[in-house]
């Protein structure tokens, strides 16, 4: 992450529940920095992947899951701390949508390498529940994002009739300081509110949007990527299978160029380039499923993100914050304290291998989508990060697979 060398600053951020007058900046990068082309994902370039994706090949294939962004892009040239250039944002993921904010989901958390932050996970580990949205931003905006989530939930959640309601939000980060004025604290509470308020199902953007705006992956322009897999589980040949979906969303900000492998092809070695002198970066991953799983089983799903990342070449370096959380939208209302007991459904451990496989496959594809559905970007001090060239990737994949 290269973030531990900065001096620590203490901020007191005061805000009410209403939005301030500043409108979130939702502009795309200047036209000169991007090509005006249609959305292109990895499969559009002929990249082969294992498994059967959901309809949208997205985390939003899991019914109820909603994703929202605030993208902050402004300024050019030399860094002026507090003014810019700004290349950052906020991502919000709501497990069962806006209509179920008061219904926690079973969840599990895993840290592959802990040079990072995902708040609230001590309580996820202890309770087995995720109680609200997941927000992802840059390293130095975790505090303001966490406070904003609490304020937003006070406004939009169930009335607090006791006066003792509390919240431990899940807010995660990766470092975008190569392109962004990260010490300028440009993410404000209203930016978090906007991402939460505008979260939706269906098709979502990838690449340099939301929290992924200023991120770098394998020394190409990185950011957000998503993918999904349909999973058929059956107990015997004589019973019809039940179909579930696993979806992965990640904020990709990791890896050296030479490590990059796509569909088994060492792409990074054939497209040389360098942004950093040493391994630097992180990955935040969110796994969603409608399969009925218990918290310990969801932790096992979260662990499998590691294998999907490894298929793209990363070794999860010392400076990497690789933090993963998984949740299930099944078993609604099981956290309701109005009943002494609840009846729940769960899949036996012996039948979980297809789910593990789906997470690995979707994670691998989500990383490549983050690289492909993207554009080159210039940020602070004219730092430039190129996007993965589509024509070259297509050529390398086609040549490699024609030789097999």
Where are these regions (language model features)?
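Alpha/propeptide regions of enzymes that mature by internal proteolysis
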Residues: 22-404
